[in-house]
Curated annotation (Swiss-Prot):
Pfam families from the UniProt entry: FSAP_sig_propep
Keywords of the record: Amphibian defense peptide, G-protein coupled receptor impairing toxin, Hydroxylation, Secreted, Signal, Toxin
InterPro entries registered for this protein in UniProt: Frog_antimicrobial_propeptide
Sequence positions bearing 4-hydroxyproline: P52
BP-aspect Gene Ontology terms: defense response
Signal peptide bounds: 1-22
Region of interest called Disordered, as start-end residue ranges on this chain: 25-61
Protein's name according to its UniProt entry: [Val1,Thr6]-bradykinyl-Gln,Ser
Single GO MF annotation: toxin activity
Propeptide: 23-50
Compartment list: Secreted
Acidic residues composition bias: residue spans: 30-42
Amino acid sequence: MSILKKSLFLVLFLGLVSFSICEEEKREAEEEENEDEIEEQSEEKKRFEPVPPGFTPFRQS
């Protein structure tokens, strides 16, 4: 009975460790995606910032 308890404990422990490693990798991947989205949004904001009044990109001579 003692051997059965030890092996069951070992299986559960290894499963828990494996699960926590997978969760950590998943969390890191989600953080990377969020950082990429934030970066893209800031680039879009920079592209479409309002132009100051009287500014013309092309000068007429």
